[in-house]
Amino acid sequence: MVDIIFNSSFLGDMGDHSKKKSGFAMCVGCGSQIHDQYILRVSPDLEWHAACLKCAECSQYLDETCTCFVRDGKTYCKRDYVRLFGIKCAKCNLGFSSSDLVMRARDNVYHIECFRCSVCSRQLLPGDEFSLRDEELLCRADHSLLMERTSAGSPISPGHIHSNRSLHLAAEPVTVRAPHRNHVHKQSEKTTRVRTVLNEKQLHTLRTCYNANPRPDALMREQLVEMTGLSPRVIRVWFQNKRCKDKKRSILMKQLQQQQHSDKTVSIFSLQGLTGTPLVARSPIRHDNTVQGNSVEVQTYQPPWKALSEFALQSDLDQPAFQQLVPFSESGSLGNSSGSDVTSLSSHLPDTPNSMVPSPVET
């Protein structure tokens, strides 16, 4: 971006800053002091004469109304900068507009129409497997045919065979990025980030090392660089992403377990709409029929007259009927012996009602 700044030294010696050499504005283009009324400043701290700030290709003057790019100490307008340093299609070598969708294969970028097999000219769609050999795209069928011919023909180095056998998966088309502004101190920066594709052998080596130690030290990373052929930065980023994915996965599993436990608890408490304390059923045990407490002996109370009546009834049943008759004398009176027996028997019995005591019969 170009900014216009008022030059205070243009008004003459009105302060101490105009007398100091450090306060003088120096033009980056011609190297002389700027005495103009206005200074054109390019971010962050490059100052120019209005007549010196122009495109190095088309000599178009650059001001605050246009975009200015700086590369290798030269200034360019947007059109020439994109034409010279912008991203180009690896097939047709033409540039991209901001609305174009592109396909990527390693460091190469293609138009959707240019993303085709170089042998059969079949367009590669998202999800198709392809290979990149000598900057040429090959579909899966042509890649297999080429490998068969190569193995049957002249021998080649094992490393070359390994590099050509890896197949890639075509991804969805993405929007091409506009080139970023490059300043003098950021000349070596790339305008795009390229996704690194790993083959099965490299992934197996990295996963084996990760299972043994998720945080390898510098010595282990150097060994992985030699074993996989990847850069140290790619290996470091792969381990960081792997740890992050595993952490997210563990957090998700923990949340699912807690959710299942809470759902199970709620289903127990709210069975048929009732709430209460959860109980745990135990194993069955034998029922103990004993009664707690001290045993008390119960005795039956019988009145004396009831015992006498039972005794009399029992004696009547035991004796014959003729013995129950009272003997009479020939004179018609009771004998003395019988009267005395009755008297003596009544004296030994307890008090009973009068109806139970026999009386002498007068004749």
Curated annotation (Swiss-Prot):
**Entry's InterPro entries?**
HD, Homeobox_CS, Homeodomain-like_sf, ISL1/2-like, ISL1/2-like_LIM1, Znf_LIM
| Cellular location(s) | Nucleus
Principal location listed in the UniProt entry: nucleus
Q: Where is the LIM zinc-binding domain?
A: 27-80, 89-143
What CDD domains would the database entry show?
homeodomain (cd00086), LIM1_Isl (cd09366), LIM2_Isl (cd09374)
Output the Gene Ontology cellular-component terms.
nucleus
Database matches in PROSITE patterns: HOMEOBOX_1, HOMEOBOX_2, LIM_DOMAIN_1, LIM_DOMAIN_2
Renumbered residue ranges of the record's region Disordered: 328-363
Q: Which Pfam families match?
A: Homeodomain, LIM
Q: Where does the record place Low complexity bias? A: 329-340
Question: What are the protein's UniProt keywords?
Answer: Developmental protein, DNA-binding, Homeobox, LIM domain, Metal-binding, Nucleus, Repeat, Zinc
Q: Which residues bind DNA?
A: 191-250
Gene Ontology biological process terms, A to Z: axonogenesis; neuron fate specification; positive regulation of transcription by RNA polymerase II
Q: Where is the composition biased (Polar residues)?
A: 341-363
MF terms per GO, please?
cis-regulatory region sequence-specific DNA binding; DNA-binding transcription factor activity, RNA polymerase II-specific; metal ion binding
In UniProt terms, what function does this protein have? Binds to one of the cis-acting domain of the insulin gene enhancer. May be involved in subtype specialization of primary motoneurons.
Name of the molecule in the record: Insulin gene enhancer protein ISL-3
Gene name tied to this protein: isl3
